[in-house]
């Protein structure tokens, strides 16, 4: 497995090249310019301004209260700290309820620096993906455990277990790519299933709690640094600052572990 090093800003073609080369893609969240600079300088390829900010920054119990205004503010902050990494941004809860509404929400995010929009779920969201892609907006499709669906799921639970559920998730992944998604994010999915999906599709997959078979990995920065968000710590989280050191060192250690395949290991992985 090659280790991808990129001295140029990340782009959609660079993502496709990484998939072809078998080079692991490193992704982390950021919510302000200071941390964004650290990520950008220490091996992170994609920076995600996630609606997870609702839980780790604002102190909510879920991502549901996060607004488009919140996302625009934090995206603008992060964009000021990013030079090389690609900036991916969540559409918050119900901002993608229709194609037109999604475009309305995505536009101010793109104006302040977003380079790709992340959308949770499948089903009617396929129409949203197509609508945005037709308007030259790159889209990341977030499948598996989608935190905006926490009320329907009844909590934060592993998705895709069992033959029927696994088959449905594989079909959703293929449909998202057919709709035009440039990137897939798979959350809390059995590692075997995530590896199958990664083989199924032509675009890169980024895993969080989805095993080492994905094309890349993402974590919430606060989790990587062992910061207490007031919520139970998921199995897939590893504290890269547990033994001391600096934030920059922890980010570099994470990036290296993703690229050499040592993270995630079995301890941080779900099975069928």
Curated annotation (Swiss-Prot):
It is found in: Cytoplasm. Catalyzes the reversible reaction in which hydroxymethyl group from 5,10-methylenetetrahydrofolate is transferred onto alpha-ketoisovalerate to form ketopantoate. This is 3-methyl-2-oxobutanoate hydroxymethyltransferase. One of its GO terms (cellular component) is cytoplasm. InterPro entries: Pantoate_hydroxy_MeTrfase, Pyrv/PenolPyrv_kinase-like_dom, Pyrv_kinase-like_dom_sf. It comes from the Bacteria. Belongs to the PanB family. The active site is at residue 187. Keywords: Cytoplasm, Magnesium, Metal-binding, Pantothenate biosynthesis, Transferase. Pathway: Cofactor biosynthesis; (R)-pantothenate biosynthesis; (R)-pantoate from 3-methyl-2-oxobutanoate: step 1/2. It comes from Xylella fastidiosa (strain 9a5c). Its EC number is 2.1.2.11. Mg(2+) binds at residues 51, 90, 120. GO terms for molecular function: 3-methyl-2-oxobutanoate hydroxymethyltransferase activity; magnesium ion binding. The gene is panB.
